[in-house]
Curated annotation (Swiss-Prot):
InterPro entries: UPF0524_fam. Residues 169-248 are annotated as: Disordered. Keywords: Neurogenesis. Residues 200-227 have a biased composition (Acidic residues). This is UPF0524 protein C3orf70 homolog. It comes from Mus musculus. It holds the Pfam family UPF0524. It comes from the Eukaryota. Belongs to the UPF0524 family. GO terms for biological process: circadian behavior; nervous system development.
Length: 248
């Protein structure tokens, strides 16, 4: 064991000698450096005991370092008198108040915009102002005016006599069948001339149930006049004559 420790001691001594030589060369440039006696003395340096720069050899390396200075008691530290009240008035509070007032004056500008109004929904039928029916006449979709409720007002004698004369005149002319145009061909359902439409199309014949072709269409054809006033096709109620699904 002694043989194993002898080379180790020799290697350590060589390192220490090399470190000390480096430390001396370092200390030679600084007159305030003083060499330590060895590792043991460097290890025993404690706070408040060394007052100069020393070099220490630790594991073969040279460390030039400052050692701690003695601590000064707290009672001996210089102190500054703190006045109980500020000698000069400060404007900190006044500035804060003025800034707050200035902000509140223009606060409305920084407010977020009002939320938009919620969308208002309406029924499609509310967008229309008149009253028509949609009927399937002879396989075609037609706008037919709805019958208005009978007026409760009584007609004057002059109106009654004029109405009877009109009825007798109409009885002399040949009647047209329902759901047929005066020309004998099926109308497209929309009267381009502006005449009235027939309300009742309940009596369909086999001949009228057949779909008409475009050749039979007569733009000058019109339906038998009705006593109701003419309105535009909107706010329509759906009535299906024949087996057909339709929508307004």
């Amino acid at each position: 064991m002694s043989a194993a420790t002898a080379p180790e001691r020799g290697w350590k001594s060589e390192k220490v000698d090399e470190a000390q030589a480096l430390a001396r060369s370092c200390a030679a440039r600084r007159p305030d450096f003083q060499p330590c006696d060895g590792l043991s003395i460097c290890a025993t340096h404690s706070h408040g005991k060394c007052f100069k720069l020393h070099w220490c050899c630790h594991l073969g390396w040279c460390h030039c370092k400052y050692v701690y200075q003695p601590m000064t008691p707290v009672e001996q530290l210089p102190s500054t008198e703190i006045p109980a009240k500020p000698r000069e008035p400060t404007n900190t509070i006044q500035i804060s108040v003025s800034l707050t007032e200035h902000f509140l004056k223009f606060a409305s500008v920084f407010q977020p915009p009002l939320p938009p109004d919620s969308p208002r929904y309406c029924m499609i039928s509310d967008l229309f102002i008149d009253n028509y029916q949609v009927k399937c006449i002879n396989g075609k979709m037609c706008y037919v005016q709805k019958q208005q409720a009978p007026h409760s007002q009584k007609m004057s004698p002059e109106e009654v006599s004029a109405h009877d004369a009109l009825i007798s005149k109409e009885s002399d002319t040949p009647k047209l069948g329902h759901c047929s145009s005066p020309s004998g061909s099926e109308d497209s359902g929309i009267n381009a001339i502006g005449a009235h439409y027939v309300e009742s199309c309940d009596e369909d014949t086999e001949e009228g149930a057949e779909l008409s072709s475009e050749e039979d269409y007569s733009p000058e054809s019109s339906w038998e006049p009705d006593e109701c006033t003419l309105l535009s096709p909107s706010q329509s109620d759906l009535e299906v004559i024949e087996t057909m699904e339709t929508t307004v």
